[in-house]
Regions:
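Long, charged, mostly alpha-helical binding arms that flank functional sites
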Residues: 257, 432-434, 440-461
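Active-site-adjacent structural elements in folded domains
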Residues: 112-115, 208, 291-299, 362-366, ...
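Active-site neighborhood of glycoside hydrolase catalytic domains
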Residues: 460-484
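Active-site-adjacent bridging/hinge elements
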Residues: 279-294, 298-299, 347-359, 433-447
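Beta-strand-rich N-terminal accessory domains
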Residues: 1-104, 122, 228, 270-273, ...
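Aromatic-rich carbohydrate-recognition surfaces in CAZymes
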Residues: 301-433, 458-462, 466
Length: 484
């Protein structure tokens, strides 16, 4: 590749950084995830809905619910405690009423009513059960209200990117117990959120559901809710809630059971290991090409090539099936043509994949983006390490054409100026200026502070290339391709 043919790299081009207004630190949050759906709540289990708030229920890079709040007589309950349980499957919160006023007087003293919220995410939907119990000595009548909204914001919007235009939103009532929120995007994809309540609320609009609850001393009322991707495939009853919670926990238990058991005489160490296993397997997501460890919630709950490969390398000793899933997924998404807007060339391994409206419209380049200099040699290195760990020659044989294509990319496109070093240089100003592990726009600079201009050769990438070629030779020999 002739360096003179490369476009001028404009350092002022957008770098898709997370905006300083997209703050998750001022509010302690709780996260649940299953598959391509995750939820970020505050400690009460609410989704706030305020401008600049990053909480929400997200599905495939779209915030499908931007507000979901529980109110008691139009007041926020007091937080007693909340936690995400050890298996990361279920969130619970204990709440109570504040002092409630009527006519300037305290009509209901604090902590007479206990509210217990239980939530989990499963197959595109958040399930919730709310228990309300009267701990007072007299009958009580209170109003419980759920306030909700969906802005259908693209994840990059939530992160701080601004858009000039949006699609159209609609809301409709469905019988007396469900609401459907719809958004027709500029990409002509309709995204639909359905909220259902059991039993039916006393009043229901397209923005709130209210229950007039009468409780005798010691009496408990249960309300079941379901909100998420509309498919109508699962019953909307309390029985369905418990069945789906068992299914969610069983699936996570079965997946994490693949990991080798690690135990010691130190209880703190054992707890750290158990929590780490739960965190890791929460991120592993089934895809049509195999299971893949997503890079992390909330901003990176999607496949990243480098992150998936390094995760697979680090976990080969406890669960090599993670590496097998990563290899198959990245082989299925390997570039086959030159596409400058994607920074793609034949044999190159994926950097990032996105599914939202902005990616579909190419307002951001990450629908299927290949701007990563290290993922391609790391792919070959992982295949070699996987073979050393497992001896699985069938997988090596199936993926050998992809490994060959990756090795060809290193020689044909990786070394852009023929100096023996593999370097990177984005092909358009819409791509990432820096394409190594440190990929912010100012990550690579000279000793005097000046920003380095491409092509840029990173020292660790040369080691990855060396490792890829050694592993490539090992695999070729195992397949009988002597002299390859």
């Amino acid at each position: 590749v002739n360096t003179s043919d490369l476009p001028v790299d404009d350092a002022s081009a957008p770098q898709y950084a997370i905006s300083a207004t997209a703050n998750l630190q001022e509010r302690r949050t709780r996260t649940l995830k299953h598959g391509d759906t995750f939820a970020v709540f505050d400690q009460r289990g609410d989704i706030g809905g305020e401008p600049g708030n990053s909480e929400g229920l997200y599905h495939r890079d779209t915030r499908i619910l931007s507000q979901f709040q529980l109110l008691l007589e139009e007041a926020r309950p007091l937080l007693l405690s909340s936690m995400t349980q050890d298996d990361n499957a279920v969130f619970s919160a204990d709440l109570s009423n504040p002092d409630l006023l009527a006519g300037g007087q305290i009509a209901l003293r604090r902590e007479q009513i206990h509210l217990h919220r239980l939530k989990f995410v499963w197959e595109g939907t958040c399930y919730e059960r709310v228990l309300a119990r009267n701990f007072g000595n007299a009958p009580l009548g209170v109003r419980l209200t759920f306030r909700f909204a969906a802005d259908f914001a693209d994840l990059f919007e939530v992160r701080g990117e601004r858009r000039k235009a949006h699609g159209e939103a609609f809301a409709t009532l469905e019988s007396g117990h469900a609401v459907v929120l719809r958004y027709l995007g500029l990409d002509q994809i309709e995204r639909v959120t359905r909220l259902a309540f059991e039993p039916a609320p006393t009043t229901l609009t397209t923005a709130r559901a209210a229950y007039e609850v009468r409780l005798k001393p010691g009496e408990t009322r249960r309300i079941f809710l379901r909100y998420g991707v509309a498919d109508g495939s699962v019953e909307w009853t309390g029985r369905g809630f418990y069945r789906q919670m068992r299914a969610a926990r069983h699936a996570l238990r079965m997946t994490s059971a693949r990991a080798a058991s690690v135990d010691s005489s130190n209880s703190v160490f054992n707890e750290i290991v158990r929590r780490s296993v739960s965190d890791l397997y929460m991120l592993i997501t089934d895809t049509p090409s195999g299971s893949y460890p997503y890079a992390g919630t909330p901003w990176f709950s999607t496949p990243f090539g480098r992150d998936g490969i390094i995760t697979a390398l680090m976990t080969l000793w406890i669960d090599p099936t993670i590496a097998k899933g990563v290899l198959h997924f990245l082989a299925a998404t390997q570039a086959t043509a030159i596409e400058p807007v994607r920074d793609a060339e034949p044999g190159k391994i994926l950097h990032e994949m996105r599914y939202g409206e902005m990616a579909n419209l190419r307002e951001v380049p990450f629908g299927r983006y290949y701007g990563s200099v290290d993922a391609t040699p790391l792919f070959v290195l992982l295949l070699g390490e996987y073979f050393v760990r497992t001896g699985d020659l069938d997988t090596v044989r199936a993926l050998w054409p992809n490994a060959e294509a990756a090795l060809r990319w290193i020689d044909a496109y990786g070394d852009r100026d023929g100096d023996g070093f593999v370097e990177y240089y984005r092909q358009t100003n819409e791509g990432l200026a820096n394409q190594g592990w440190k990929d912010s726009h100012d990550a690579v600079f000279h000793s005097d502070g000046r920003t380095a201009e491409g092509p840029i050769a990173l020292c660790e990438v040369q080691a990855y290339v060396y490792g890829a070629k050694r592993h490539g030779a090992l695999l070729a020999g195992a397949l009988g391709h002597h002299g390859a």
